[in-house]
Amino acid sequence: MPKRRDIETILVIGSGPIVIGQAAEFDYAGTQACLALKEEGYKVILVNSNPATIMTDTEIADKVYMEPLTLDFVARIIRKERPDAILPTLGGQTGLNLAVELAKAGVLEECGVEILGTKLEAIEKAEDREQFRALMNELGEPVPESAIIHSLEEAYAFVEQIGYPVIVRPAFTLGGTGGGICTNEEELVEIVSTGLKLSPVHQCLLERSIAGYNQIEYEVMRDANDNAIVVCNMENIDPVGIHTGDSIVVAPSQTLSDREYQLLRNASLKIIRALGIEGGCNVQLALDPDSFRYYVIEVNPRVSRSSALASKATGYPIAKLAAKIAVGLTLDEMINPVTGKTYACFEPALDYVVTKIPRFPFDKFESANRRLGTQMKATGEVMSIGRTFEESLLKAVRSLEIGVHHLELNEAKTAADDVMEKRIRKAGDERLFYIAEALRRGVTVETLHEWSQIDRFFLHKIQNIIEMETVLKNHPGDLDVLKKAKGLGFSDAAIAALWNKTERDVYALRRQEGIVPVYKMVDTCAAEFTSETPYYYSTYEEENESIVTEKPSVIVLGSGPIRIGQGIEFDYATVHCVLAIKQAGYEAIIINNNPETVSTDFSTSDKLYFEPLTAEDVMHVIDLEQPVGVIVQFGGQTAINLAAELEARGVRLLGTTLEDLDRAEDRDKFEQALSELGIPKPAGKTAVSVEEAVAIAEEIGYPVLVRPSYVLGGRAMEIVYNREELLHYMEHAVRVNPQHPVLVDRYITGKEVEVDAIADGETVVIPGIMEHIERAGVHSGDSIAVYPPQTLSDDVIAKITDYTVKLARGLHIVGLLNIQFVVAGSDVYVLEVNPRSSRTVPFLSKITGVPMANLATKAILGAKLADMGYETGVCPVRPGVYVKVPVFSFAKLRNVDISLGPEMKSTGEVIGKDVTFEKALYKGLVASGIQIQPHGAVLLTVADKDKEEAVELARRFADIGYQLLATNGTAETLKAAGIPVTVVNKIHSASPNILDVIRQGKAQVVINTLTKGKQPESDGFRIRREVENGIPCLTSLDTARAMLQVLESMTFSTTAMTEGLVRS
């Protein structure tokens, strides 16, 4: 079937901000799809609220709308643009749910818009648990016994029939939100209540738990001609019961016999045909390891996290082909872009093993519940490729950047046997390391299988790794053993530890003896046909397939897995850096290991190496390619942290020199630079012991800001108000010693301002200045940022500009620079300087029109900004107001305090743009998922230090007709100021207490500022956790004040005439 000529304009819905369960894989899919549709000659309109994406760049679609992904705003765009069709299957759950809403609201019918790709009925059949179950029964495909419930009573009735354990899955939610496994009544009540609340249709599926079965996934594609193929099948190492997004996954499956493989393949193809899906689809199945029994778990009728993984694992571009299928092309008429020869209807064949390991945010959230279950908790993932499972697994482990270079974890090493067993029986994010430790202690594979339900095949493979450790230990310096160990994926660091040598010794020995990796190509066809894609992985074999060209090359280091503090913004900068290198006439080579992103799409760079970002793995590529130099500015802290080791090994770093990077990162050198330049910063010193920290704090006066040196995303940063808190911090958050000093600074309450600049050694271009709504002390990544600044005087802006230019020149910055200032009155202090690309680069590039990463790269390669038409200073302000609003994933992470502070907690961001600040902020808040109600009740419970300030806010809430509810202390203050208020009891008092009010939906907004209680049992903590009920809870009065401004601009004030007279 040729492509359709009856449609011209297509609206593509993006997936919005990054949250747990919906990350960068949709930027990758959406970018691919928009480009594919443009390639076929269609006009593409994109709507997405996430400014950090490549897909919202103006060149990706013909028109880009960065507006909230809500029924209201998307309907406006449809009415204005009148597209012929809409493609929702690339926007994740957000896109699917919006399509369903637009159809139900009659907007699509009213404007004559057709849904492309998977039809609405198919989406509903796959997503609605009841319809799906009916279809499976019709097809004779087995599903676990289950019941659809809408209330707790119905849940009890089902459990009485089949008994515990049962799995709860809410309908139409993302990443298993609200779901879980219940083994008793208490868990049933809790999980079912939350699940019903979080499901937009108040419906949950309860099913018999088949936890412990092997979990297998098939990624399938089908076109309108009913051609269907399996792109890739994958096996979860963790058994059923753990969300596939939190599971370690291998492709292709390792434990299936041919009969099992065919059985599940046929079921998957039968299901995609019955659903009539046109495009990509993911089928999840559970297989009983001891018989041929299997169950269908679920189907995702859209591009998903698994399809991004399958695309990168096979090289087969699912999203691109899905978009073309949506406009009528068929698999047998499209060429597979990887080989350039075979058609897309050839099923990919793999001659290597791919391993994906999730990256969890628990290094940021120490108190979070680390147990894994049906609700997803990972923020990102890494992928690695090897010739054997062992090699692939070890490469993935060292890609995670969790401070381990092998299957070894200190906590596991020191754990008592009973603790170890518990950690293996109840899966957490570190289970793999405990299994390795158990094998070292002589626990048998059989016992481990019984504890973990993990297939014996994988346990035997891990045992191979452990046995090799012993061989290495017994044969120090033996070259044959060294060769075998490298073949199993051992890192130099792991071998060095077993041989009591340094990592560089092992590396030197290998080079001298010629024990170095070769690079193999990912070609989708197991080398059956020649392939055109320069996409490589390393392995220890004979033949090298990566050919070095004559053209001078530049290597760019990517930013690795997405985690809190280092998100998709860095991938955005990496991609733009690569494009600029190509424009400058060099060959662009990228090294990265994140399967979700655009940077690891093989069509982005001239060569892609899918490798761990460690000194050893990066050096291997450098040794082969001999580049002009390496760029580390765009890969976040991941790349910056490799700079010193690479330079020590003789690598040329391009852009800002290592010495200058160090001057910005090292506290004492930085202070010296500031005093030479005459730029003020808050008083503070460096401590190398607990006693010293206390002495410094008492000298400069509390409150102080404490943090370790060299961190990203404010890890382990805190504001402490007295000696006791400081001691608690020193004991729990950091291990202070002369190698790891702790910084103690005076905490200044003021406005925080953030600036990004581009410098080439002479010219310093400042695209824009952003003012933060939350005062200093809230991490910049968690603050609402506004451009242009709304309250800064010309004098302050001039100071900020002057300091920025002085710093860029004084630190000899070549490339990008990010500075955070705090403004108190007319004084401007520098808080910190990051000599690299930052989180705000995509946002600023888009709203100011200055292509920051592109200019910075050209400056790094030696071009002058003045020759490109830029001059020193702030660029002219663009019309309009733009806000960047952070988005959090708290509903997925239990036991995490949502209060904002110096430690970053947001996973993503959205943009709001309009003509006034209030309108822009309204859009930003709505896009971030905060429901803004023009009337209702606000519940206030604030710390003593905030009471005075809260009075003015409360009065303004009352003036626009909001009812005020408050706890005792706060209520007294309000009454004293003559403001009417209803008292609500504290948590431990009689009903209706504060939690009842929130749970019954009697408050539309909660404002709760920090009473010092970080522990889960404090009242404030429990109030703030009510985000699980989906009510906006603001923990900073600045955010509340901004929201009030929005509400005031939406409502008319109603005051009686006499009131007006009395007040004046």
Swiss-Prot record:
- GO CC annotation: cytoplasm
UniProtKB keywords: Amino-acid biosynthesis, Arginine biosynthesis, ATP-binding, Ligase, Magnesium, Manganese, Metal-binding, Nucleotide-binding, Pyrimidine biosynthesis, Repeat
Entry's PROSITE patterns? ATP_GRASP, CPSASE_1, CPSASE_2, MGS
What are the EC numbers? 6.3.4.16, 6.3.5.5
* Annotated region described as Carboxyphosphate synthetic domain, given as residue ranges: 1-401
Positions of the MGS-like domain: 930-1064
UniProt: Mg(2+) 1 binding residues: 284, 298
Annotated segments matching region Allosteric domain: 930-1064
Residue positions binding Mn(2+) 4:
832, 834
Q: A single Gene Ontology molecular function, please? A: ATP binding
Q: Give one Pfam family, short name only.
A: CPSase_L_D2
> How is the cofactor bound, as the UniProt entry phrases it?
Binds 4 Mg(2+) or Mn(2+) ions per subunit.
Catalytic activity field: hydrogencarbonate + L-glutamine + 2 ATP + H2O = carbamoyl phosphate + L-glutamate + 2 ADP + phosphate + 2 H(+)
The residues the record assigns to binding Mg(2+) 3 are: 820, 832
For the ligand (Mg(2+) 2), the binding residues are 298, 300
Task: Report residues binding Mn(2+) 1.
Answer: 284, 298
Entry binding sites for Mg(2+) 4? 832, 834
| Residues annotated for Mn(2+) 2 binding in this entry | 298, 300
Gene3D superfamilies per the record?
A: 3.40.50.20, ATP-grasp fold, A domain (3.30.1490.20), ATP-grasp fold, B domain (3.30.470.20), Carbamoyl-phosphate synthetase, large subunit oligomerisation domain (1.10.1030.10), Methylglyoxal synthase-like domain (3.40.50.1380)
Q: What does this protein do?
A: Small subunit of the glutamine-dependent carbamoyl phosphate synthetase (CPSase). CPSase catalyzes the formation of carbamoyl phosphate from the ammonia moiety of glutamine, carbonate, and phosphate donated by ATP, constituting the first step of the biosynthetic pathway leading to pyrimidine nucleotides.
Tell me the domain comment: The large subunit is composed of 2 ATP-grasp domains that are involved in binding the 2 ATP molecules needed for carbamoyl phosphate synthesis. The N-terminal ATP-grasp domain (referred to as the carboxyphosphate synthetic component) catalyzes the ATP-dependent phosphorylation of hydrogencarbonate to carboxyphosphate and the subsequent nucleophilic attack by ammonia to form a carbamate intermediate.
Assembly behavior:
Composed of two chains; the small (or glutamine) chain promotes the hydrolysis of glutamine to ammonia, which is used by the large (or ammonia) chain to synthesize carbamoyl phosphate. Tetramer of heterodimers (alpha,beta)4.
What protein am I looking at? Answer: Carbamoyl phosphate synthase pyrimidine-specific large chain
Q: Which organism does this sequence originate in?
A: Geobacillus stearothermophilus (Bacillus stearothermophilus)
